[in-house]
Amino acid sequence: MFSGKECRLLSDPYFRLIRQTDNFYEIQSRNTGHFWIIQKNRASQRYPVTVYHKHTQDTPYYHRHGQSYTVSSALKQIESHDIYQINGRKAVCSVQIL
């Protein structure tokens, strides 16, 4: 289901390949060590690519992180997430304790 171009994108040195099937690639970011699944869905679905994420190998499950129209866009989501993690996560709100 993945085109030659998509396979080359997923083989980028930015990632470490964990597992590959016809329907998904399981990869690890070399920058953060986070694990990702890029899954190709049926063409009839609105978003043909779903992105799943987990922080460590020991975490028993992945959570859905996002969807995209292309594998390239999904990989940009991962790189954006890595930048967010590396630059330090900012609190959504702060509580002042008196």
Regions found by a protein language model. Give the residues of each.
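Negatively charged, low-complexity tracts enriched in Asp/Glu with abundant Ser/Thr
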Residues: 1-33, 58-60, 91-98
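Mixed-charge, Lys/Arg-enriched low-complexity segments
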Residues: 4-7, 53-98
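Short aromatic-glycine-(Arg/Gly/Cys) micro-motifs in beta-strand/loop hairpins
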Residues: 33-63
